[in-house]
């Protein structure tokens, strides 16, 4: 029975210029705000964010929860704890993302992992792309951005920017025994909430455009089972919060939680919700000065 390990809706390679739909809104100061200026400011913020985040470690708590047809919990969740950090290399080549998340497994269902214990299909990868990297100045070409007005997030005014991929590309499918990881480049659609004055990102929601059929190789097919899987839904929502640090004193807006819901017809894990929460942020000091 095939289990879907990871579904992503962005491609791996991006070039230089963003495609922008320049629809004007007004910020809280009454100044005109267009998508092109907003996206440029947010992209600059993401660069500064990565420069700071690379000196931070956080505990990531993951709950992998099977869901019933009505999307209620179905059985027990698998719970994992990781120590997580961001690696930032602005000079990375196009085929190797400049920002990555690296994980060290600390516990499985509250117990230390065994030395030879292999990860299960739905467990997070030890290394994965950082989700804001597509907003960097040289990584936006395959997206269209559109200003979507103002809103409020946790009492803060937020400008909203909608985005979607320019055109779909061929799915990238990687099989490992009965596990499969799927990237769906060119099928992303989403919304960014950002502070109109500081460009701090407060929330990021993303899903896929349309349904996607994935052929199941004969080796992975169940007896009498389907020859394909259909990805019907792959939605994620990232929420951010302010975190205060000392020595030196600094407040950063960092991830608080990520919730991901996937529905994959004809798979071994047809409905799953993965919840990630981030606690115990702490900074490790290197010989380099923290970039302002």
Language-model segments: residues:
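Structured extracytoplasmic
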Residues: 29-189, 196-203, 207-292
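Bacterial N-terminal signal peptides
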Residues: 12-27
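A general, composition-driven signal for non-globular sequence regions
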Residues: 4-7, 20-21, 35
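Bacterial N-terminal signal peptides that target proteins for export
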Residues: 1-16
């Amino acid at each position: 029975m095939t289990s879907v390990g990871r579904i992503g809706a962005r491609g791996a390679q991006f070039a230089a210029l963003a495609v922008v739909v320049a629809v004007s809104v007004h910020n809280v100061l009454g100044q005109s705000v267009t998508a092109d200026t907003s996206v440029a400011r947010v992209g600059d913020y993401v660069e500064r964010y990565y420069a700071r985040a690379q000196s931070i470690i956080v505990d990531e708590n993951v709950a992998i929860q099977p869901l019933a047809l009505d999307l209620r919990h179905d059985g027990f969740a698998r719970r994992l704890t990781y120590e997580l950090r961001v690696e930032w290399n602005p000079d990375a080549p196009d085929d190797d993302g400049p920002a990555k998340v690296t994980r060290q497994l600390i516990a499985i269902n509250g117990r230390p992992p065994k030395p030879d214990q292999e990860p299960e299909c739905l467990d997070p990868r030890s290394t994965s792309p950082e989700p804001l990297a597509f907003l960097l100045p040289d990584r936006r070409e395959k997206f269209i951005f559109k200003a979507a007005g103002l809103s409020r997030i946790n009492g803060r005014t937020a400008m909203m920017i909608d985005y979607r991929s320019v055109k779909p590309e061929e799915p990238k499918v990687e099989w490992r025994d009965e596990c499969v990881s799927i990237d769906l480049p060119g099928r992303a659609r989403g919304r960014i909430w950002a502070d109109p004055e500081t460009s701090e990102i407060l929330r990021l929601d993303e899903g896929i455009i349309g349904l996607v059929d994935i052929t199941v190789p004969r080796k992975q097919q169940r007896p009498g089972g389907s020859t394909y899987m259909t990805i019907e839904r792959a939605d994620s929502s990232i929420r951010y919060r302010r975190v205060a640090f000392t020595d030196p004193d600094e407040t950063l807006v960092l991830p608080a939680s990520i919730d991901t819901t996937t529905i994959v017809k004809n798979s071994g894990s047809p409905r799953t919700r993965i919840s990630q929460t981030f606690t115990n942020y702490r900074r490790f000091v290197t010989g380099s000065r923290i970039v302002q």
